[in-house]
Swiss-Prot record:
Protein source organism: Pseudomonas fluorescens
Gene field: inaW
Record-linked SUPFAM superfamilies: Phage fibre proteins
PROSITE patterns, per the entry: ICE_NUCLEATION
Domains as described in the record: Contains 122 imperfect repeats of a consensus octapeptide A-G-Y-G-S-T-L-T; further on a 16-residue and a regional 48-residue periodicity is superimposed.
Keyword Signal: no
Miscellaneous comment text of the record: A structural model is suggested in which the ice nucleation protein displays a symmetry related to that of ice.
Transmembrane domains' residue ranges: none
Principal localisation: membrane
Function: Ice nucleation proteins enable bacteria to nucleate crystallization in supercooled water.
Membrane topology qualifier: Peripheral membrane protein
Protein name: Ice nucleation protein
Length: 1210
């Protein structure tokens, strides 16, 4: 009886594990390793006998596996409290759903009926009782024909209440409730409620509620609520709420809320809220809120907010806010805010803000702000701000600002500012500013400024400034300034200035200045100045000056000056001066002077002078003088005098006099006199005199004199004199003199003199002199002199001199001199000199000199010199020199020199030199040189040289040279040279050379050379050469050469050569050559040759040759030859030859030839031998052999004629 079997029902998890972690098999034996024969639940396998009794071992999860197992009756132990049965081992006979498991038991119970006595009861409903008690409800098996059994379980029901539980459960249900729970669970339900939970769960609900949860979950719901959750979840809901969550989730909701979330999520909602989230998300919402998020997201919202976000996003919102964002985004908003962003974006906003941005953007806004931006943008705004920008832009604004910009722009604004800009622009503004600019512009403004500019413009303004400019303009203004300019203009102003100019103009003003000018004008003003000029005019003024001029005029004024002039006029005034002139006039005044003249007049005045003259007049006056003259007058005044003269006048004054004269006047003054004269005047003054003259004047003064002259003047001064002259002047001064001259002037000074000249001047100075000259000047200085000259100047200095010149100048310096020159200059320096020159210059230096030159320059240096030059320059250096040059330059150096040049340069170096050049350069080097060149270069070197060149270059080297070249290059070398080239190159070398080339190259070498080439290359070599080539190459070699080629190559060799080729190659060799080739090759050789080829080959040789080939080949040879081939071959030979072929081959021999057919009989090879001229075998007739070893004549129509077999040798 104890060995009989019974059926036990239980459930496992979806992965076939029970609550203790034991994995049950699908079918077969299962055993408990920790079995103890007690009535406790632990240490054993458990279940419901015949599926009846307590349901403690049964799970209500939808994915649970229902297991039916067979247990030996003797192993059964009935557990306490009617909790089922316990057993140490069992055999699983069925795994499926609840329905299939119960069906299996019903179908198989009759098989165990003999052993079922007193173990089975028929399931019946008990009478309904009113009390509630802790019970273990039974799980029924609804079959009517099951045998009677012992009473091992009891079923009890409350009034209109259905309760189903297992051991350790507590169920309390009100009227019309249904409670189902696993073991160890606690459920409490109000009226008309339904609670279903797994083991270890806790469920509490009000009336009309529904709770469904997995094992270990906790559900608490008010009335009219619905809770659904996976195992291990916690749900708490007020009335009229609906909560749905996956396993391990936590949901808390007040009255009227709807929460839906994936597993592992956390949801907290106030009344009347709706939360939807993916697994692992966290949602917290106040009342009347709606939150929707993807998995792994976090959302926090106050009352009345609406949040929508993709997976992995974070949203935080105050009350009545709306947030919409893509996956991975972060949004933080105060109340009454609306945020919309693409994936991966970050948005932060205070109360009442509206933010919209593309993916990957960052937005930060204060209260009541509006931000709109494209993807990848960054926006930061204070309260009550509005920002709009294209993708990739950056905008930063304080409270109350409005910013609008195109893509890729940058905007920074203070409070209450307005910025509008095109794409790629940069705007920075202080508070209460307004900036408007086209694309690519840059604007910077302080508080309260207004800037408007076209595209590509630059505007910088202080506080309370207004800037308006066309495209491409540049404006810089201090506070309280107003600037207006056309396109391409430049305006710079300090605080409180007002500038207005046409297009292409330049305006520079100090504080509180006003500038008005036409297009193309230039204005420069100090503070508190007012400048007005027509188009193309130039005005320069210091603080507090007022200048007014017509178009094309030039005005220069000191501080607190007033200048008024017609169009085309020129005015120059010191401080506190007033100048008034008609159109085309020229006025020059020192400080405190007052000049008034008609049109076309010229006025020159010292300080605190007053000059009045008619139109076309010339006035020259010293300090504290007053001159008045008509046009064409001449004025001469003594010391402290005041002279006034008209056109062409002559003025003469003694010491302390002040002279003023018109054009063409002559002035003579004593010592301490001040002379001022017009154009073409002549002035002579005594000791300590001050002379001022116009254009073309002549001035002569003794010691301590100060001379000032106009254009073309001549000045002569004594000791310690100071001379200033205009263009084309001539000045001669004694010791320690200071000379200043205009363009084309000539200055001569002795020791310790300082000379300054204009363009085209000539200066000569003694010892320790300092010379400065303009363009085209000529300067000559003694020892330790410093010379500075403009363009086209000529400077000559002795030892330890410092020379600086402009473009096109000529400099000559002595020992240890340093020379600097502009473009196109010519410099010649002595020993240890340093020369620097601009473009197109010519420099010549001796030993140990350092030369630096610009583009197109010519440099020549002595021993151990270092030369650096620009593009297209020519450099020549002595021994051990280092030369560096730009593109297209020409470098020539002697022995042991290092040369570096740019593209297209030409280099020539002596012995042991190293040359490096750019593309297309030409290099020539002496013995033992190293050459490196770019693409398409030409290199020539003597013996023991190393050449490296780029693509398409040409290299020629002497004996024992090494050449490396790029693609398509041409290399020519002497004997014992090593050549390496790229694809398609041409190599020519002398005897005993090694040549290596890329694909498609052509190689030609002398005797005893080794040639290696890539695919498709051509090689030609003299006697005793070794050739190696890639696929499809062509090789031609002299006598006694060895050729190796790849497949499909063509080889031609002289007598006694050895040829080795790949398949499909063509070989031609002279007499007594040895040819070896792969399959599909063609071999042609002269007499006494040896040919070896693979299958599908074609071999042709002269007399006394030996031909060996594979199957399917054609062999042709002259007399006295030996031909051996495989199957299906055609062998043809001359007289006295020996032909060997296998089955399927055709043999044709000349007179007295032997034909041998190799036959296979299944065990061994046998030979069928015939001879021409005997046995009815004719010469020059093709013969074959059939499968029966019969020799047949191969007819032209492919028909076979048998030969007398009796005559055939076995």
């Amino acid at each position: 009886m104890k060995s009989e079997k019974v059926l036990v029902l239980r459930t496992c998890a979806n992965n076939m594990t029970d609550h203790c972690g034991l994995v049950w098999p699908i079918l077969g034996l299962v055993e408990c390793k920790f079995w103890e024969p007690t009535i406790k639940l632990e240490n054993g396998l458990t279940g419901a006998l015949w599926g009846q009794g307590s349901s403690a071992q049964l799970s209500m999860n939808a994915d649970a596996k229902w297991v039916v197992c067979e247990v030996t009756m003797g192993d059964l132990i009935f557990l306490e409290n009617n909790e089922g049965v316990k057993f140490p081992r069992a055999e699983v006979v069925h795994v499926g759903t609840r329905s299939s498991a119960l069906g299996y038991i019903s179908d198989n119970v009759s098989k165990h009926e003999a052993c079922s006595s007193n173990l089975i009861e028929k399931f019946t409903f008990s009478d309904v009782k009113s009390e509630t008690r802790n019970i273990s409800p039974a799980l029924p098996v609804t079959v009517d024909n099951m045998p009677n059994g012992v009473n091992r379980s009891t079923t009890v029901r409350n009034t209109q209440t259905l309760e189903t539980a297992v051991y350790g459960s507590t169920l309390t249900g009100a009227n019309q409730s249904q409670l189902i729970a696993g073991y160890g669970s606690t459920e409490t339900a109000g009226d008309s409620s339904t609670l279903i939970a797994g083991y270890g769960s806790t469920g509490t609900s009000g009336s009309d509620s529904s709770i469904i949860a997995g094992y270990g979950s906790t559900g608490t719901a008010g009335s009219d609520s619905s809770l659904i959750a996976g195992y291990g979840s916690t749900q708490t809901a007020g009335g009229d709420s609906s909560l749905t969550a996956g396993y391990g989730s936590t949901q808390t909701a007040q009255v009227g809320s709807n929460l839906t979330a994936g597993y592992g999520s956390t949801g907290t909602a106030g009344p009347d809220s709706s939360l939807i989230a993916g697994y692992g998300s966290t949602q917290t919402a106040g009342g009347e809120s709606s939150l929707t998020a993807g998995y792994g997201s976090t959302q926090t919202a106050q009352v009345g907010s609406d949040l929508t976000a993709g997976y992995g996003s974070t949203g935080t919102a105050g009350s009545d806010s709306s947030l919409i964002a893509g996956y991975g985004s972060t949004q933080t908003a105060g109340g009454d805010s609306s945020l919309t962003a693409g994936y991966g974006s970050t948005q932060t906003a205070q109360v009442g803000s509206n933010l919209t941005a593309g993916y990957g953007s960052t937005g930060t806004a204060g209260p009541d702000s509006s931000l709109i931006a494209g993807y990848g943008s960054t926006q930061t705004a204070g309260g009550e701000s509005s920002l709009t920008a294209g993708y990739g832009s950056t905008q930063t604004a304080q409270v109350g600002s409005d910013l609008t910009a195109g893509y890729g722009s940058t905007g920074t604004a203070g409070s209450d500012s307005s910025l509008i800009a095109g794409y790629g622009s940069t705007q920075t503004a202080g508070g209460e500013s307004s900036l408007t600019a086209g694309y690519g512009s840059t604007q910077t403004a302080q508080v309260g400024s207004d800037l408007t500019a076209g595209y590509g413009s630059t505007g910088t303004a202080g506080s309370d400034s207004s800037l308006i400019a066309g495209y491409g303009s540049t404006q810089t203004a201090g506070g309280d300034s107003s600037l207006t300019a056309g396109y391409g203009s430049t305006q710079t102003a300090q605080v409180g200035s007002d500038l207005t100019a046409g297009y292409g103009s330049t305006g520079t003003a100090g504080s509180d200045s006003s500038l008005i000018a036409g297009y193309g004008s230039t204005q420069t003003a100090g503070g508190d100045s007012s400048l007005t000029a027509g188009y193309g005019s130039t005005q320069t003024a210091q603080v507090g000056s007022d200048l007014t001029a017509g178009y094309g005029s030039t005005g220069t004024a000191g501080s607190d000056s007033s200048l008024i002039a017609g169009y085309g006029s020129t005015q120059t005034a010191g401080g506190d001066s007033s100048l008034t002139a008609g159109y085309g006039s020229t006025q020059t005044a020192q400080m405190g002077s007052n000049l008034t003249a008609g049109y076309g007049s010229t006025g020159t005045a010292g300080s605190d002078s007053s000059l009045i003259a008619g139109y076309g007049s010339t006035q020259t006056a010293g300090g504290d003088s007053s001159l008045t003259a008509g046009y064409g007058s001449t004025q001469t005044a003594g010391h402290g005098s005041i002279l006034t003269a008209g056109y062409g006048s002559t003025q003469t004054a003694q010491e302390g006099s002040s002279l003023t004269a018109g054009y063409g006047s002559t002035s003579t003054a004593g010592p301490e006199s001040s002379l001022i004269a017009g154009y073409g005047s002549t002035q002579t003054a005594g000791h300590e005199s001050t002379l001022t003259a116009g254009y073309g004047s002549t001035q002569t003064a003794q010691e301590d004199s100060s001379l000032t002259a106009g254009y073309g003047s001549t000045s002569t001064a004594g000791f310690n004199s100071s001379l200033i002259a205009g263009y084309g002047s001539t000045q001669t001064s004694g010791y320690e003199s200071i000379l200043t001259a205009g363009y084309g002037s000539t200055q001569t000074a002795q020791d310790n003199s300082s000379l300054t000249t204009g363009y085209g001047s000539t200066s000569t100075a003694g010892y320790q002199s300092s010379l400065i000259a303009g363009y085209g000047s000529t300067q000559t200085a003694g020892y330790e002199s410093t010379l500075t000259a403009g363009y086209g100047s000529c400077q000559t200095a002795q030892e330890q001199s410092w020379l600086t010149t402009g473009y096109g100048s000529t400099s000559t310096a002595g020992y240890e001199s340093r020379l600097i020159a502009g473009y196109g200059s010519t410099q010649t320096a002595g020993y240890k000199s340093i020369l620097t020159a601009g473009y197109g210059s010519t420099q010549t230096a001796q030993e140990e000199s350092s030369l630096t030159a610009g583009y197109g320059s010519t440099s020549t240096a002595g021993y151990a010199s270092s030369l650096i030059a620009g593009y297209g320059s020519t450099q020549t250096a002595g021994y051990d020199s280092i030369l560096t040059a730009g593109y297209g330059s020409t470098l020539t150096a002697l022995d042991s020199s290092t040369l570096t040049a740019g593209y297209g340069s030409t280099e020539t170096a002596g012995f042991g030199s190293s040359l490096m050049a750019g593309y297309g350069s030409s290099q020539i080097a002496g013995y033992g040189s190293t050459l490196t060149a770019g693409y398409g270069s030409t290199q020539m070197a003597e013996r023991d040289s190393t050449l490296t060149a780029g693509y398409g270059s040409t290299g020629t080297a002497g004996q024992d040279s090494s050449l490396i070249a790029g693609y398509g290059s041409s290399l020519t070398s002497g004997m014992r040279s090593y050549l390496t080239a790229g694809y398609g190159s041409t190599l020519i070398s002398g005897l005993q050379s090694v040549l290596t080339a890329g694909y498609g190259s052509s190689l030609t070498s002398g005797i005893r050379s080794s040639l290696t080439a890539g695919y498709g290359s051509n090689q030609i070599a003299s006697h005793k050469s070794s050739l190696i080539a890639g696929h499809e190459s062509t090789q031609i070699a002299g006598h006694k050469s060895m050729l190796i080629a790849g497949k499909g190559s063509s080889q031609t060799a002289g007598s006694r050569s050895t040829l080795i080729a790949g398949a499909n190659s063509v070989q031609m060799a002279g007499d007594r050559s040895r040819l070896t080739a792969g399959a599909n090759s063609i071999q042609t050789a002269g007499d006494r040759s040896k040919l070896l080829a693979g299958s599908n080959s074609y071999l042709t040789a002269g007399d006394r040759s030996k031909l060996t080939a594979g199957d399917d080949c054609v062999l042709m040879a002259g007399d006295r030859s030996k031909l051996t081939a495989g199957k299906n071959c055609v062998l043809t030979a001359g007289a006295d030859s020996r032909l060997i072929g296998s089955l399927g081959s055709t043999l044709s021999g000349g007179e007295n030839s032997t034909l041998i057919f190799r036959c296979w009989d299944g065990k061994r090879y046998t030979n069928v031998v015939v001879k021409t001229g005997t046995d009815e075998v004719e010469a020059d007739v093709p013969y074959q052999i059939d499968e029966d070893s019969n020799v047949l004549i191969k007819a032209e129509d492919n028909s076979d004629t048998p030969v007398d077999q009796s005559q055939i040798q076995p």
